[in-house]
Amino acid sequence: MSNERYNARESEPKWQAKWDEAKIFATRNDDLRKKYYVLEMFPYPSGRIHMGHVRNYTMGDVVARTMRARGYNVLHPMGWDAFGLPAENAAIERKIAPKAWTYDNIAAMKKQLQTMGLSLDWAREFATCDPSYYKHQQKMFLDFLKVGLVEREKRKLNWDPVDMTVLANEQVIDGRGWRSGAVVELREMNQWVFKITKYAQELLDALDTLDRWPDKVRLMQRNWIGRSEGLMVRFALDSATTPAGETELKIFTTRPDTLFGAKFMAIAADHPLAQAAAAKDPKVAAFIDDCKKRGTAQAEIDTAEKQGIDTGIRAMHPFDPSWKLPVYVANFVLMEYGTGAIFGCPAHDQRDLDFVNKYQLGNTPVVCPEGQDPASFVITDTAYDGDGRMINSRFLDGMTIVEAKEEVAKRLETAQLGGAPVGERKVNFRLRDWGISRQRYWGCPIPIIHCPTCDVVPVPDADLPVVLPEDVSFDKPGNALDHHPTWKHVTCPKCGGKAVRETDTMDTFVDSSWYFARFTDPWNTEAPTTPDVVNRMMPVDQYIGGVEHAILHLLYSRFFTRAMKAAGHIDIQHDEPFAGLFTQGMVVHETYRKADGHFASPAEISITVEGDTRRATLLDGGSPVEIGPIEKMSKSKRNTVDPDDIIGTYGADTARWFMLSDSPPDRDVIWSEEGVKGASRFVQRLWRMVNDAAPIAASAPAERPASFGADALTLRKAAHGALDKVLSGIERLAFNVSLAHIREFSNTLGDALARSQTPSPDLAWAIRESTVILVQLFHPMMPHLAEECWTVLGQTGLVSEALWPQIEPDLLVEDSITLPVQVNGKKRGEVTVPRDAPTSEIEAAVLALDAVKQALGDKPVRKVIVVPQRIVNVVG
């Protein structure tokens, strides 16, 4: 066996240079082969890549290299999601301009990514902070405005008091800003919004077409869109208790069947009726002020203690005007959802039950489970939300829930209040329009001018892009564009008078909602897309990224392709940007805590193993270290591993192989030094194996032998079986399964080499074929090693340009088959026989089985039924 070691430090830069020189990963838009577009979510240029990047981009690269080998015109680009708050924070903390900080980080991260050997088309690279990119984003904003998909409206918005910017509802997590962690406040402000709700039903329906998306992501989007069918009901207000001018309270409910269980009404703190009540009652006003300081995230509202205050206003039951319901301002009702008002039926809604138990309002069950005595059915601490029949509901008693809903709807549709129906069937959506205005400097400027005479004026297309000024100061909190002495002062393009620019910039999620389309032709200076190119190259066939983007980025991107179609910039099948989506798991690592409570990094400790016990000590001084739980790699826990260190020590191929081999790709991968060392040993083993096979391959006949002996045929079957299984794994993105088959086949080939000192010509030919196949199998995962091995085997060109080997179907057929055996219809065992065995031979093998003899006992065999290649049934 060869003792020569593979030198990754020498090999990897060499092959990367050859790939770049040959431009083999550049994609031609005029290439008419079938396209395949693979894309990993582009990174934010924080300054360093982490092991999560290595895993994510390696997965995409395996897909790209495999599809390229299969003859597709592969598009595999890379860019930078470059706007955002960290650049402004760096400007404040380090006194460096956001632009300089961002582009310095891009240069550093690009250099790191290039050491990974990714098959990227770098010619298409752009950053979203490039004016040449956001020029087109501004153009699309104006085009969306023309077709009614952009509006300006005054809204109660989530205000982050630390970052001093507005956040979308999705960016409020547990009542706190997703970046700053500050408690979010509600403020009324002017806001530019994208009308995503116009596509609510379409976005919901189209989820059923996304059969290559994870079910959990589709469910998350389905729940976020939140379609519900129900009834809009108008409750008359008791004039004796109601502020002047208020006559009714409108609510939306999906459970009109429970109206006779109503015990209270509840309204949001910013509902007009609440404001009217607050004007008369200081206690109500104080409660409303307290509500405004609380979080707005649905999860926090659902888990917070239910609180309210009685306004003194009374609403009349729509079926009985003498039945008066108290109207509360409640902390669990939001103006953004439905009408900002509800009726509470505590017996059948846990939230409502918690509320009435707190304020002693009582409850009346109106749905009784089947088979239970209505007279004894009571609700105490747990609401009943199951099926049953109506009770305590007058004319609804005895009906099913479905029947009761229909009866209530019919009656309220015909009843009148103020000349309009009391009830109206309605479809409601949880989804709200996307507020994109952000009070930050480092973002895409909104191309609008505010004129005291002409009001809102779009920036003319000829004046795009509206470029960010670079001479800004961050000495004051808030938006640096507001403080700039000259940038915002302009002449109105409509009347020529003095005007000011819009100083809000776009939410950075806008930047990432269409970048995938721009990659199809980033050289177009006149328009965001080139229609014939984008329509041919889109959708993305395989998109890879984190599940944390399930709602924000992925939903916004789905809206954007539809908006771009409405504006004439794209027209693709199903209007969906991503045909296939894969959400990879995280990279996790043990944590290590020193005696003083501070965390230690993996580079600072030594691990020793004594039997089943692992101990950690500091390299400096030998002090014991507590081995903590396995957690997501993070700077705060200091459990990160620097990709540069791993690549510098072991090589990129080792890092790539380990990231793919340890666990299913949709699950977290536990980083371990032992695992990386194991991957490195496998790299060296493959290198030695190929070098051992090279002389045999060189001596093998050029022409395919007319026939193959048993050893050669066995090896060829293993090779073609591996081809089939590895490709199947890659197609299913089950990379760890593919790698296991590569290991298995390498063992088979290694055994054949060990037995074949002077192989026959047919076996030598099979060894050459099998070794070439092995190299092509691991090429997508370890491309540098594959190129080196390709050369050793005397193959021409680059393995990165070689076509995937053709599988010979005959070699996938097993010589033997295993058939289930039944005795009198009950399975008793299995029998393995040659595939072409005659019926008599199969019968004899079956009757010789101990399990069959035992099942028959003393009974004679009446007949044996053999269903060819399916099953055998013995009748006794």
UniProtKB/Swiss-Prot annotation:
Entries under InterPro entries matching the protein: aa-tRNA-synth_I_CS, aa-tRNA-synth_Ia, Leu-tRNA-ligase, Leu_tRNA-synth_edit, M/V/L/I-tRNA-synth_anticd-bd, Methionyl/Leucyl_tRNA_Synth, Rossmann-like_a/b/a_fold, tRNAsynth_Ia_anticodon-bd
SUPFAM superfamilies per record: Anticodon-binding domain of a subclass of class I aminoacyl-tRNA synthetases (SSF47323), Nucleotidylyl transferase (SSF52374), ValRS/IleRS/LeuRS editing domain (SSF50677)
A Pfam family matched in the record: Anticodon_1
Subcellular location(s) of the protein: Cytoplasm
Span of the annotated motif 'KMSKS' region: 632-636
One function term, GO molecular function aspect: ATP binding
E.C. designation(s): 6.1.1.4
Annotated binding of ATP, by residue: K635
Main subcellular location: cytoplasm
Keyword ATP-binding: yes
DNA-binding keyword on record: no
Membership in a protein family: Belongs to the class-I aminoacyl-tRNA synthetase family.
Protein name: Leucine--tRNA ligase
Recorded name of the encoding gene: leuS
